[in-house]
């Protein structure tokens, strides 16, 4: 019985650590919409700087949008949507 208890505590701690160390790769969202990089001259540099401002580790242009690596967990997964007026 002790072995089962120790194993369950180990699993609980392991799952808790996995949640802390999880990171996300996301398309960059600024002002509620995806950031376009299609027509920019310095595609890689602009996306990299914008992503780092959002606390990502790196960014690049994955046309037509900027793509950021290792985004914070609380970063939006979708752009803002507006309900249509009826």
UniProtKB/Swiss-Prot annotation:
Listed Pfam families: Toxin_3
**Keyword Transmembrane set for record:** no
SUPFAM superfamilies named among the record's database cross-references: Scorpion toxin-like
Question: Where in or outside the cell is it found?
Answer: Secreted
Write down the InterPro entries for this protein, in alphabetical order.
LCN-type_CS_alpha_beta_dom, Scorpion_toxin-like_sf, Scorpion_toxinL/defensin
Is Signal among the key words of this record?
Answer: yes
Q: Enumerate the UniProt keywords alphabetically.
A: Disulfide bond, Ion channel impairing toxin, Neurotoxin, Secreted, Signal, Toxin, Voltage-gated sodium channel impairing toxin
Query: What does UniProt note about where in the body, tissue by tissue, this protein is expressed?
Result: Expressed by the venom gland.
Q: What domain of life does the UniProt record list for this protein's source?
A: Eukaryota
Q: Where is the LCN-type CS-alpha/beta domain?
A: 24-86
Signal peptide positions (record)? 1-22
Cysteine disulfide partners in this protein: 37-61, 47-66, 51-68
Q: What does this protein do?
A: Binds to sodium channels (Nav) and affects the channel activation process.
**Entry's family note:** Belongs to the long (3 C-C) scorpion toxin superfamily. Sodium channel inhibitor family. Beta subfamily.
Domain comment in the entry: Has the structural arrangement of an alpha-helix connected to antiparallel beta-sheets by disulfide bonds (CS-alpha/beta).
Q: What is this protein called?
A: Mesotoxin-1
Taxonomic source organism = Olivierus martensii (Manchurian scorpion)
Q: What is the lineage of its organism?
A: Eukaryota, Metazoa, Ecdysozoa, Arthropoda, Chelicerata
């Amino acid at each position: 019985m002790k072995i089962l208890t120790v194993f369950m505590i180990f699993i609980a701690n392991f799952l808790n650590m996995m949640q802390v160390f999880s990171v996300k790769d996301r398309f960059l969202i600024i002002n509620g919409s995806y950031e376009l990089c299609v027509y920019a001259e310095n595609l890689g540099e602009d996306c990299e700087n914008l992503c780092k401002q959002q606390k990502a580790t790196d960014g690049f242009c994955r046309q037509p949008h900027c793509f950021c690596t290792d985004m914070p967990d609380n970063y939006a997964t979708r752009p803002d949507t507006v309900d249509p007026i009826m």
